[in-house]
Amino acid sequence: MSQHDPVSAAWRAHRAYLVDLAFRMVGDIGVAEDMVQEAFSRLLRAPVGDIDDERGWLIVVTSRLCLDHIKSASTRRERPQDIAAWHDGDASVSSVDPADRVTLDDEVRLALLIMLERLGPAERVVFVLHEIFGLPYQQIATTIGSQASTCRQLAHRARRKINESRIAASVEPAQHRVVTRAFIEACSNGDLDTLLEVLDPGVAGEIDARKGVVVVGADRVGPTILRHWSHPATVLVAQPVCGQPAVLAFVNRALAGVLALSIEAGKITKIHVLVQPSTLDPLRAELGGG
């Protein structure tokens, strides 16, 4: 058990982050979970003491598994469902600055996934790792077994394709990403202290699935959130919806709820949980969540 205990700790520390990363790449919660589980299986088999940066190692393995999956799906011409049907009409062209970067708006639309489908496998992985998760090209090069210069070229091509596709693609502000990920990791680990750090003291939330009932105050909202959404069968991933930071909650790989977050000055000020079937059914059909 001496080797299993550190892996269990790694699972608690990194699983939520890795599932979020994998979901951004493959667009299917079931596949994302499988990729992360396989990465941890390989960590369990890795020689003790050979890994200096545990999260970095897991990012590399998970990303390579996702890349292999995307390549395999492309070969079989199996592409995820077109989720743009659920959220259409907001297409716009991002302007490009002199460095030829996509000028990304203030939020991520669900259309991000369908936009990524227009990229080749390597382009997709590089774009997600660099533009969304902020990893440097040198680290990405290690991940995909290439050179940093090649990764820059892949990113350049990806940004060109995104602009040419005329699909609205935007990345939520960096602060929103940090807060949302901290929220997810706290919930995934049942860590009330960390959750309270990202909640505004006066946070208000409709979070108990009873319409019109609002809970106010971090000391009440935090425990209620954990009671409903911190379970072994629950997987949370960041996926802004309709222009608002949000978290998708999957239970046994089926979409069970959408937690819409209002974030101000680095704190969550409002949480609205959507669990009505009429709201979730269209998303379930499009996100591969059952």
UniProtKB/Swiss-Prot annotation:
Q: Which UniProt keywords apply?
A: DNA-binding, Sigma factor, Transcription, Transcription regulation
Extent of motif Polymerase core binding? 34-37
Pfam families cross-referenced by the UniProt entry:
Sigma70_r2, Sigma70_r4_2
Where are the stretches annotated Sigma-70 factor domain-2? 11-74
MF annotations from Gene Ontology: DNA binding; sigma factor activity
DNA-binding region(s) from the entry: 137-156
* Keyword Transcription in record: yes
Induction: what does the entry report? Constitutively expressed at a low level under all conditions tested. Transcribed under control of SigJ.
SUPFAM superfamilies from the UniProt entry: NTF2-like, Sigma2 domain of RNA polymerase sigma factors, Sigma3 and sigma4 domains of RNA polymerase sigma factors
Q: What is known about its subunit structure?
A: Interacts transiently with the RNA polymerase catalytic core formed by RpoA, RpoB, RpoC and RpoZ (2 alpha, 1 beta, 1 beta' and 1 omega subunit) to form the RNA polymerase holoenzyme that can initiate transcription.
Q: State the family it belongs to.
A: Belongs to the sigma-70 factor family. ECF subfamily.
Q: What NCBIfam families does the entry give?
A: PRK09635.1, sigma70-ECF
Q: What is this protein called?
A: Probable ECF RNA polymerase sigma factor SigI
| Lineage, opening ranks | Bacteria, Bacillati, Actinomycetota, Actinomycetes, Mycobacteriales
